[in-house]
């Protein structure tokens, strides 16, 4: 089945970007070989130099797109400094792409705590042991830190580190791209002046 056959109707007629994203993600979950929620996250440092890396989307709704990270990591520091970010989803099996960008807010402690509890125990230990984005003298040093925190939290719940939480991108732009023959692709961008503004839909040249 081709990507064009998967979605009923013409996606360019949609006026609801979050609903359209939900439909596309659901189809990606059925067709991508792994991690359909993987997304390229772009941030910029204090000199305006961009950095990009893959993260996993952990939730989305009409308020925005959520992912979790160490706030002392490179991306954490850059987002806290600029409070803006961009994402790009690419589903090769569907020949589709979604780009979005906008201001970023920190999720509530309750949201972060609830998600942290769902993580594998080893991942929760790792959140304590890893000084993310800092130089590491050896693999042994990391394994030693993991062993120390494993012993410290051998019994009971593992608390969420204060430096580990989530960010929510509240998009002011969401673009849906779909491959078409001869590079005459379909591109639809939804724009709004602020995260609470009304959406304007614009068809873009490919």
From Swiss-Prot:
Cofactor dependency: FMN
Molecular functions per Gene Ontology: FMN binding; pyridoxamine phosphate oxidase activity
Binding residues for substrate: 58, 115, 119, 123, 183-185
Binding site for FMN: 53-58, 68-69, 75, 97, 132-133, 177, 187
Record text on cofactor binding: Binds 1 FMN per subunit.
Biological or metabolic pathway of the protein: Cofactor metabolism; pyridoxal 5'-phosphate salvage; pyridoxal 5'-phosphate from pyridoxamine 5'-phosphate: step 1/1; Cofactor metabolism; pyridoxal 5'-phosphate salvage; pyridoxal 5'-phosphate from pyridoxine 5'-phosphate: step 1/1
SUPFAM superfamilies hit by this protein: FMN-binding split barrel (SSF50475)
GO terms classed as biological process: pyridoxine biosynthetic process
Alphabetical UniProt keywords: Flavoprotein, FMN, Oxidoreductase, Pyridoxine biosynthesis
EC number: 1.4.3.5
EC category: oxidoreductase
Catalytic reaction equation(s): pyridoxamine 5'-phosphate + O2 + H2O = pyridoxal 5'-phosphate + H2O2 + NH4(+); pyridoxine 5'-phosphate + O2 = pyridoxal 5'-phosphate + H2O2
Listed Pfam families: PNP_phzG_C (PF10590), PNPOx_N (PF01243)
Assembly: Homodimer.
Function: Catalyzes the oxidation of either pyridoxine 5'-phosphate (PNP) or pyridoxamine 5'-phosphate (PMP) into pyridoxal 5'-phosphate (PLP).
Family according to the record: Belongs to the pyridoxamine 5'-phosphate oxidase family.
Name of the protein in its database record: Pyridoxine/pyridoxamine 5'-phosphate oxidase
Originating organism: Rhizobium etli (strain CIAT 652)
Gene: pdxH
């Amino acid at each position: 089945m081709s990507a064009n056959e998967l979605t009923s109707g013409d996606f360019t007629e949609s006026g609801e970007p979050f609903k359209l994203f939900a439909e596309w993600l659901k189809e990606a979950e059925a067709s991508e070989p792994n991690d359909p929620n993987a997304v390229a996250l772009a941030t910029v440092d204090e000199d305006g130099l961009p950095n990009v890396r893959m993260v996993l989307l952990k939730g989305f709704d009409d308020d925005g797109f959520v992912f979790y990270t160490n706030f002392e990591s490179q991306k954490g520091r850059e987002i806290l400094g600029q409070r803006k970010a961009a994402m790009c989803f690419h589903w090769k099996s569907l020949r589709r792409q979604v780009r979005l960008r906008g201001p970023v807010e920190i999720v509530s402690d309750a949201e972060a705590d609830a998600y942290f509890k769902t993580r594998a125990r080893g991942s929760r230990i790792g959140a304590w042991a890893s000084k993310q984005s800092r130089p590491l003298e050896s693999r042994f040093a990391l394994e030693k830190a993991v062993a120390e925190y494993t012993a410290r939290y051998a019994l009971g719940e593992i608390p969420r580190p204060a430096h580990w939480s989530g960010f929510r991108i509240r998009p002011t732009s969401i673009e849906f791209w779909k491959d078409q023959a001869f590079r005459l692709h379909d591109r639809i961008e939804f724009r709004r002046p602020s995260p609470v503004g009304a959406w304007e839909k614009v068809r873009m040249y490919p």
